[in-house]
Amino acid sequence: MCIRDRRKEGGINLRTNFDPLKEIWKNRPAIPENPVEIQPMDFAGETAVSKIARVRKALRGVHADGMLVSALDDIAWTLNLRGTDVHCNPVFVSYLLIASDKVSLFVDEAKLTDEIRAYLQEAGISVYNYNKVEEGLKQYAEYNILLDSNETSYHLWKTVKCQEIISQNSPIPAMKAVKSEAEIAGYRRAMVRDGVAMVKFLKWLLPAVEAGGETEISIDKKLTALRAEQDLFRDISFDTIAGYQEHGAIVHYEASPETDIPLKPEGLLLLDSGAQYQDATTDLTRTIALGPVTDEMKHIYTLVLKGHIQLELAKFPDGASGTQLDALARECMWREGLNFLHGTGHGVGSYLNVHEGPHQVRMEYMPAPLRAGMTLTDEPGLYLAGKFGVRIENTVLIQDYKETEFGKFLQIESLTLCPIDTTPIDVETVSYTHLTLPTKLEV
């Protein structure tokens, strides 16, 4: 029995045009009117017209005449536009309706400069006010419309009165996941700048902690300031996780004035951070010894490092799923009855959302195939509640490896350029391979 039938059976009427927050959140801010910006071709590598043509081709393949795009990063990528409406994510509040004969952008028109209007007009994109999306959908009564149930609100789903609703995943995330040559070049440039900021930070950190007065929040501010010195810096890509000692065992910890603690010249600091540069998005984690560490810390740190390296050295068939690779990062931990409960890797946007799909590396089955040109994170970890946590993360690129009679094979290249702390390594338990991974930046 579907949810609609259950509601009828129970006498429940679902009002999808009612916003309960309007009654509760009295001082709710309005939708931002921040201006939209063009993502230059030097960074995008493909025009909006070309991307729309690819989307239309994919729609024809499933006998759809059009689709509603609700995911903000999909809209930004398709149109080569960026915004600042969402914290840490360079997107803008909007809807996009791509049909076989028309493309309509529904957005607060106050966001659009004359330059943006001319750009959209040249690309054949009509602009309508954000709150006109329902009217726009009603014009397609004779069409077969694709709606992605993961992204489309039930209210808009119910609004669509067309020949047929094709309920399928949007084709855009899979297109967006494979980076253009220009985007890959942007990652390489941005990683150098981000690496410079990180190396400056690491060189500053230990003396600053030794001198006293540094806390989880203060070092976060220091790192952000160093990144802001770099060319093309726009923002951080997510709120920094700076977890010292037992706070490092809280996977998604975020320091607040109530939880902030001082750093001491001992133990481990887990630092998960990233930046938005106009030519790429970065995401990396380093676990740093601030002074003497225990044998237990060394053992756990070394297991995580082994898992991280094991995944980074992987060679695998084109089209393999992230689930098939996930065990590579966990096997050395499993041998000791240890595990971590978050994903091992996620896609990373190109000056877009730091978390991107559809591909992931995780234990749960993720059928999305891995292809050359995709970016991923490699971030295994181990967390001992009340004690400490360890995570080591690079952003990586999937590349062609070789082709044999058994098909095409892929490999992984690390894009992140930041030293991994060797102080906590238990050198008696690692191999030559573990100790000789190259890095271009040194403290």
Predicted regions and their residues:
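Short acidic, glycine/serine/threonine-rich loops at helix termini
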Residues: 4, 26-30, 78-83, 108-109, ...
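Glycine- and charge-enriched low-complexity intrinsically disordered segments
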Residues: 408-435
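Acidic/histidine-enriched ion/cofactor-binding microenvironments in catalytic or ligand-binding pockets
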Residues: 88-92, 97-100, 249-278, 356-403
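Short, compositionally biased
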Residues: 7, 281-298, 389-402
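Conserved small/polar residues in nucleotide/adenosyl-binding loops
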Residues: 1-3, 433-439
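Flexible, acidic/His-enriched mid-domain "rim/lid" segments that flank
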Residues: 4-93, 98-106, 128-233, 245-247, ...
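Short, basic/aromatic beta-hairpin or loop at an interaction surface
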Residues: 236-249, 344-358
